[in-house]
Structure formats: structure tokens, C-alpha cells
Amino acid sequence: MSYEYDDELEEIRRRKMLELQRRLEEERRREEEQARLRAQKDAILRRLLTSKARERLANLRLVRPEIAEAAENAVIQLVQTGRITPPVDDDTLVQILLELDRSTRRDFEIRIKRK
């Protein structure tokens, strides 16, 4: 009886270990894919942006990574559609950032109801 119980426990442990290994492998693969995509995007942006614009974007990425990501995507899209031509300078990047800020800003109003 105890041998069966031990065998069942060992089988459960083995399955859990396999599941954990599978998850870790999947997470590692996902991280590698993200790193590969990041490297591709960085290479594209190096060709599209001036050094000052890249510096501004790097500083922004430290403080507001989601805004930096949106700006990177916007620059790539604008160049692909021909709306701006490379190299994208710092002034153009600032204009793109201002436009992103305007489009994502939420105005809200606080109302206080008194009884």
C-alpha cells in the first residue's frame, strides 16, 4: 500500500516538475523573442533618428517607457507612410511627442456635491 502511495506521489512530483520546466522554457523563449524584436527596433531607430533624438528617446524610456514605446512606433509608422523623411531630428520628435500627449491626455473634472 505504501509503495503505491509513494509511486503516486512520485508521479505527481514528476508531472509538476515537467510542467514547471515547460513554463520556464516557454518564458525563456518569450523573453528571447522580445529581446530579438527590441534589437530589430533599435537598429531601425538608429537609422531613422539623429543622435540627439535618440538621446531624448532613451531618457524618456527611463521615465515613461510606455510613452517612449508609442513614440518609437509613431516614428517608424510616419517614416513608412512617407509623412516624414529620415533622419528624424529632435524638433520633429518633440512635435510627435506633443501630438501623442494631446491624443492620450484625459481631461477630467471633479464635482463635489454638497448635501
From Swiss-Prot:
Keywords linked to the UniProt accession: DNA-binding
Sequence intervals crossing the membrane: none
Pfam families, per database record: dsDNA_bind
SUPFAM superfamilies in UniProt: Double-stranded DNA-binding domain
Keyword DNA-binding (UniProt): yes
Keyword Plastid in annotation: no
Gene Ontology CC entries for this record: cytosol
A Gene Ontology molecular function term of the record: DNA binding
Family: Belongs to the PDCD5 family.
Protein name: DNA-binding protein APE_1087b
Source species: Aeropyrum pernix (strain ATCC 700893 / DSM 11879 / JCM 9820 / NBRC 100138 / K1)
